Amino acid sequence: MKIVRNVEQGSWDWMRLRAGKVCGSELKYLITDKLAVRGWKTDMPNSYLYRKLDEKWIGGPREAFAGNRQTDQGTLSEPVARKYFASLLDTDIETVGGIESDDGRCWVSPDGLVNSQTGLEIKCPNGEKFIGWLLNGPHVPPEHILQVQFGLYISGWPSWWFLAYCKSYPHLAVPVEHNPTIAATIKEALYGFNDRFDEAWKILCEKNGGPPEPPQKKEPTQERPLFSWDQGAVNESDDSSQGIIP
């Protein structure tokens, strides 16, 4: 794997680097909340495949996510939370652009690194959601299990921290280890995705008479889209009861 430094998360260069790659926050489009690989006869994985093909073709995202009330809160609170947890863990936390897999087909964007060997996933939810996490913890909330385990899968590191912060409340800090069962599911999902991606890319290039022209660098539009892939909800009735090995 390759740690990408000197690139700010959320910048256009960052968006370009992760374009066309499977990202940790997007794994839900390939794997259900019950931690099963989604069938390719359903719309969700196919729509995700088309989106990633489009990103690679044009060299970046089609549109930029401008944020919403929840993500704005998280963005504003994250630096405060990072300083808080640096003090709690008694260590320096390095911010990086992301981590790219060895084959260059996957990308994770940790919220920090500890000693370049442990990743951090920091969440700063509103009070209502945070209380639920505290009362049902200490463990990684089901909706964030895949993202954390994907970081472990791509990096190959033995541990990752899930850290949740909400001002005036006690913190939630969960050390996470590699889960081989989830890793096997991720591997299966990526194999199916990459196989279909390669076949579709070959067809697109044949129809085009060759690969696309190299993209020109440009700034994305700042209008908020009607739907964001990273922030859009996946509506499924049952939450996964499968936990994380602490």
Segments the model singles out, each with a brief description of its role:
Residues 185, 192-224:
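Polyanionic, low-complexity intrinsically disordered segments
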Residues 1, 80-83, 159-163:
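Intrinsically disordered, low-complexity boundary segments flanking structured domains
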Residues 41, 45, 49, 77, ...:
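Alpha-helical structural motif
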Residues 16-18, 44, 61, 111, ...:
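Short, isolated positions within intrinsically disordered regulatory regions of eukaryotic proteins
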Residues 1-76, 211-246:
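Charged, glycine-rich intrinsically disordered N-terminal tails and low-complexity linkers that flank
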Residues 71-93:
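Acidic-basic catalytic patches of nuclease active cores, encompassing PD-(D/E)XK
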Residues 13-16, 29, 37, 109, ...:
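Polar/charged alpha-helical tracts
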Residues 89-110, 114-201:
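Nucleic-acid nuclease catalytic cores
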